[in-house]
Amino acid sequence: MFDVTLLILLGLAALGFISHNTTVAVSILVLIIVRVTPLNTFFPWIEKQGLTVGIIILTIGVMAPIASGSLPPSTLIHSFVNWKSLVAIAIGVFVSWLGGRGVTLMGSQPQLVAGLLVGTVLGVALFRGVPVGPLIAAGLVSLIIGKQ
């Protein structure tokens, strides 16, 4: 039996390898392994909790320098007096807000998810982006189409 989904995943993994983006390639290969093994029973959990687990792991990575002490408290304090750091804080707040809108939109309009995912995978694979794009992209879409 011909599995079109598997073929698409293999194509996306190949795109990840061709573009030297191991994040995309490894992620898709893990999903392929899950798909073709008895682990496929975990897909409902992955679909429901995967985004949350991914955000937790991403947050751990971002917060690690603070927790390890390699980013001293004095640097954090100085971020409130440097104009570039203040811009970074403002942009961080804005992007977090967009991501929140994106999560809401993806839940309320699942027909948009496919386009967001394809765009994100292409952005990650071709432009060396990172796969946080669907949430922010969905937030931007929500601003354009007027949905929360």
UniProtKB/Swiss-Prot annotation:
Membrane topology: Multi-pass membrane protein
This protein's GO CC annotations: plasma membrane
Domain of life: Bacteria
Annotated TM spans: 14-34, 51-71, 86-106, 121-141
A UniProt-annotated Pfam family: DUF441
Predominant location: membrane
Compartment(s) where it occurs, according to its Swiss-Prot or TrEMBL record: Cell membrane
Keywords per UniProt: Cell membrane, Membrane, Transmembrane, Transmembrane helix
Family under the similarity heading: Belongs to the UPF0756 family.
Name of the molecule in the record: UPF0756 membrane protein CKO_01811
Source organism of the structure: Citrobacter koseri (strain ATCC BAA-895 / CDC 4225-83 / SGSC4696)
